[in-house]
Amino acid sequence: MAKTSNKVKRNANKANIFKLLADNRYAKFQYEISETIEAGIELLGTEVKSIRNGKANLRDGYCSFRDNEILLLNVHISPHKNVGSFFNHDPLRNRKLLLHKKEIIKMKSSTEKKGMTIVPLNLYLKGSWIKLTIGVGKGKKLHDKRQDEKQKSIKREINSALKR
């Protein structure tokens, strides 16, 4: 019988650890998210350092298709402060998302419907890898947002009444 080493066990435990680095609460308010997928991102070294320091902003980000690839556009990752300007990255550059071909086809078919778009939701560490959760969503109208706010306030009131 083969014996598993302690190193393998430690690495398996590290893969289950999640650390949230950036969250797009604005997208959850603006869009009605119907489907989510976890994707990897193609990053430069200075981008990884900045993201680990919490210097990423997903608020205005969205995804686009080009040559059977999904690109992450308009996501701001601040330049790393301890690196010279020659070696630093462009904060708003387009970044390729790493997905399987079937997942790309599925996302593309779901966004062909009118009003559907792909937005980044969360940026987090999974083990030592930086992952991004993207979601397919449809933009909410003003009255939809108001209804959501009413439902949240009703839930808050019910929970506070139950705690008493």
Swiss-Prot record:
<dbReference type="InterPro" id="IPR020081">
    <property type="entry name" value="SsrA-bd_prot_CS"/>
</dbReference>
<keyword id="KW-0694">RNA-binding</keyword>
<dbReference type="InterPro" id="IPR023620">
    <property type="entry name" value="SmpB"/>
</dbReference>
<dbReference type="Pfam" id="PF01668">
    <property type="entry name" value="SmpB"/>
</dbReference>
<feature type="compositionally biased region" description="Basic and acidic residues">
    <location>
        <begin position="145"/>
        <end position="158"/>
    </location>
</feature>
<dbReference type="GO" id="GO:0070929">
    <property type="term" value="P:trans-translation"/>
</dbReference>
<dbReference type="InterPro" id="IPR000037">
    <property type="entry name" value="SsrA-bd_prot"/>
</dbReference>
<comment type="similarity">
    <text>Belongs to the SmpB family.</text>
</comment>
<protein>
    <recommendedName>
        <fullName>SsrA-binding protein</fullName>
    </recommendedName>
</protein>
<feature type="region of interest" description="Disordered">
    <location>
        <begin position="141"/>
        <end position="164"/>
    </location>
</feature>
<dbReference type="GO" id="GO:0005829">
    <property type="term" value="C:cytosol"/>
</dbReference>
<comment type="function">
    <text>Required for rescue of stalled ribosomes mediated by trans-translation. Binds to transfer-messenger RNA (tmRNA), required for stable association of tmRNA with ribosomes. tmRNA and SmpB together mimic tRNA shape, replacing the anticodon stem-loop with SmpB. tmRNA is encoded by the ssrA gene; the 2 termini fold to resemble tRNA(Ala) and it encodes a 'tag peptide', a short internal open reading frame. During trans-translation Ala-aminoacylated tmRNA acts like a tRNA, entering the A-site of stalled ribosomes, displacing the stalled mRNA.</text>
</comment>
<keyword id="KW-0963">Cytoplasm</keyword>
<dbReference type="GO" id="GO:0003723">
    <property type="term" value="F:RNA binding"/>
</dbReference>
